C-alpha cells in the first residue's frame, strides 16, 4: 500500500555491494634449467591471493512508528482549517472527502454509507434534519465474513465546536494507524471507519450515535460473526494516561488486553472506573459484539468553541496511538 505524502517517512534500504576475491597473482617466469633429481629440486613459488573484501550486511529496516507530528497535523487540518463539523453540514462533507482521499492514498478500498439524521438540538443549537455519512476503509480483497477487527472514530462535532479533542484527535490516530497497517500489516485484517453523526441531537440512545448504529444495521450475519472486536477512539489527546474502557455488556477481553499491552509497552493508562456507553462502541456492544474504547478524559473546552488544536497534547496522542498500534499488530 502507498503511504500518505503528508506523513511520508522515506525508508531507504542500503544494499551492500558484493566484492568477490581478487584473482591470484601470476608467478614470475622462471629460467629453463636441466632436470634435477627430486632431492636437488627446489619448490616452485606459490601465488599469493589477495584477501577478499568482506560483504557488508544490509541494514535492517526499522519498524514503522506512530508519527505524532503527522497526527497533530491532521488535528490542525480538521479542527483548525475546517472547524466545526456538524454531521449534516457542508463542513462535515468536506472533512469526509478529505478522510476518504487519505484512505485512498494509503491504498485502501473506500466506501461511504449515507444515512438520515433527524432535526434536534446540538448542544443548545437547533439543527435541521439532513444526511450524514460514514467513511469506511477496507484492505484490498477484504472478506468481511473472515475474522477481522474494526477501529474507528467519529468525525463530526457539535454545532459550535471545532472539535480538536472531540474528535479530530481520534480521527487523526485512525489515519496514522491505517498508514502503519499499510506498511506492516496487522494480526487480523482491519477496517478503519470515520463515523458520522456520533454527537447527539437530543437525549437518549435514539438521538445519538447515528453513524455507528447505521453501520451495525448494515452488517450481515457473516460479517457479525467475522468481527472479533471493535474499538472506538474518542477524545484521546487530553491527559497524561490513556483511559481504557469497555461497556456494561461486552466481555472485558479487549480492555484487559489493552492493559496488558500498556504494561509491556510502558504506556501510562487508567482503567475506566465505570462501564462506558458514550461513544460508537456502544452501538456494536448493544448488538452483542465485543468492544473497547480508548479515551474520555474530561477537559475544559468540551463541546465548546474553545476545543481548539492547542487543547490536544501530542504526548497523549502518541500514547494512544502506540497502544492502539500494539493492539492491532
Question: What would you call each of these model-derived segments?
Answer:
Residues 17-21:
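Bacterial signal peptide processing site
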Residues 158-257, 261, 267, 273:
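Acidic/histidine-rich catalytic neighborhood of metal-dependent amide-processing enzymes
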Residues 1-15:
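Sec-dependent bacterial lipoprotein signal peptides
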Amino acid at each position: 500500500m502507498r503511504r500518505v505524502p503528508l506523513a511520508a517517512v522515506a525508508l531507504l534500504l542500503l544494499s551492500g555491494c558484493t566484492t568477490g576475491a581478487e584473482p591470484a597473482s601470476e608467478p614470475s617466469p622462471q629460467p629453463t634449467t636441466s632436470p634435477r633429481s627430486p632431492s636437488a629440486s627446489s619448490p616452485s613459488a606459490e601465488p599469493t591471493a589477495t584477501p577478499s573484501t568482506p560483504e557488508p550486511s544490509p541494514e535492517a529496516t526499522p519498524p514503522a512508528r506512530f508519527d505524532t507530528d503527522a497526527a497533530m497535523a491532521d488535528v490542525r487540518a480538521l479542527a483548525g482549517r475546517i472547524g466545526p463539523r456538524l454531521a449534516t453540514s457542508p463542513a462535515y462533507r468536506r472533512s469526509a472527502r478529505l478522510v476518504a482521499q487519505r484512505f485512498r492514498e494509503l491504498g485502501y478500498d473506500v466506501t461511504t454509507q449515507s444515512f438520515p439524521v433527524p432535526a434536534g438540538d446540538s448542544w443548545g443549537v437547533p439543527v435541521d434534519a439532513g444526511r450524514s455519512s460514514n467513511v469506511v476503509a477496507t484492505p484490498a480483497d477484504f472478506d468481511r465474513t473472515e475474522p477481522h477487527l474494526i477501529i474507528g472514530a467519529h468525525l463530526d462535532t457539535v454545532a459550535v465546536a471545532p472539535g480538536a479533542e472531540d474528535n479530530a484527535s481520534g480521527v487523526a490516530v485512525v489515519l496514522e494507524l491505517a498508514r502503519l497497517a499499510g506498511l506492516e500489516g496487522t494480526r487480523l485484517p482491519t477496517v478503519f471507519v470515520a463515523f458520522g453523526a456520533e454527537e447527539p441531537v437530543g437525549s437518549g440512545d435514539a438521538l445519538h450515535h447515528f453513524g455507528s448504529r447505521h453501520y451495525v444495521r448494515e452488517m450481515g450475519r457473516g460479517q457479525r460473526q467475522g468481527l472479533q472486536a471493535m474499538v472506538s477512539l474518542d477524545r484521546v489527546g487530553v491527559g497524561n494516561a490513556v483511559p481504557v474502557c469497555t461497556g456494561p455488556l461486552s466481555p472485558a477481553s479487549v480492555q484487559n488486553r489493552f492493559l496488558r499491552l500498556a504494561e509491556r509497552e510502558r504506556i501510562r493508562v487508567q482503567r475506566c472506573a465505570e462501564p462506558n456507553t458514550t461513544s460508537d462502541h456502544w452501538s456494536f456492544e448493544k448488538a452483542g459484539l465485543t468492544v473497547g474504547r480508548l479515551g474520555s478524559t474530561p477537559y475544559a473546552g468540551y463541546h465548546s468553541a474553545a476545543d481548539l488544536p492547542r487543547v490536544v497534547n501530542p504526548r497523549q496522542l502518541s500514547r494512544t496511538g502506540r497502544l492502539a498500534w500494539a493492539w492491532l499488530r
